């Protein structure tokens, strides 16, 4: 219900896919909705739409930035993510010893606000600031004090955005200048999560598996490990399992 209040199109999704999203929520221990931990986004199922002759919409679970922080925190990891903007001092070197130095500069944002003048709405400011992003990075610290980094360049972020399912949908968070910073922070954190020590953290391991499945072109319909109430009742509809 809360997901439908945030995005009414969710209520148009096929019930089986909504049920599978609820299962993912329960598996990961992440609430659905405005808390930003797990979102349900509607995506058109082109194959079923052609078969049915009417638009068929699937619900897809999307782990939010706050969801990843919660999942990784269960392994005792402390997580930070930041954005590096054009004009801010920056040094990043890989090798036997990683080096990351970033000095945030509030004057970058202040300059944008001054340039916009009376038109400096939050969305207008973020629209320009988003264009100035040059890197996104995450920092993870283990309970033993080991710190690791993950850095994505602007080119990598743009590629991730271009490959995101539903990126061009009217309600895609990628198209919202206020949501875009959270999306790129989530993107770099998702990539970092695949390299972090999460053995024994079943929810985090499952989250990584789900993200990898969807990134590889899989769908909620063929995601392994989910119960299918229609199949259990012997009433599975054609196409629901593929």
Task: Give the predicted meaning of each segment.
Residues 1-199:
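Binding-interface segments
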Residues 203-242:
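Glycine- and charge-rich intrinsically disordered segments
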């Amino acid at each position: 219900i809360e997901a439908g209040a945030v995005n009414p199109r969710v209520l148009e999704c096929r019930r089986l896919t909504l049920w599978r999203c609820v299962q993912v929520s329960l598996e990961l221990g992440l609430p659905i909705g405005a808390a930003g931990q797990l979102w349900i986004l509607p995506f058109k199922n082109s194959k079923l739409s052609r078969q049915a002759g009417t638009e068929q919409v699937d619900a897809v679970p999307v782990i939010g930035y706050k969801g990843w922080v919660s999942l990784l925190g269960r392994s005792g990891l402390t997580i930070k993510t930041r954005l590096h903007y054009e004009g801010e001092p920056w040094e990043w070197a890989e090798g036997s010893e990683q080096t990351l130095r970033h000095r945030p500069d509030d004057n970058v944002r202040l300059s944008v606000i001054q340039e916009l003048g009376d038109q400096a709405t939050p969305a207008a400011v973020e629209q320009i600031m988003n264009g100035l992003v040059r890197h996104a990075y995450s920092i993870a610290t283990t309970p033993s004090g080991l710190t690791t980094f993950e850095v994505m360049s602007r080119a990598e972020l743009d590629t991730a955005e271009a490959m995101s399912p539903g990126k061009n949908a009217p309600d895609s968070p990628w198209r919202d200048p206020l949501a875009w910073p959270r999306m790129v922070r989530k993107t770099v954190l998702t990539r970092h999560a695949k390299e972090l020590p999460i053995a024994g953290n079943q929810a985090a391991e499952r989250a990584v598996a789900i993200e990898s499945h969807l990134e590889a072109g899989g769908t909620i319909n063929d995601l392994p490990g989910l119960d299918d109430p229609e199949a259990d009742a012997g009433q599975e509809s054609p196409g629901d399992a593929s």
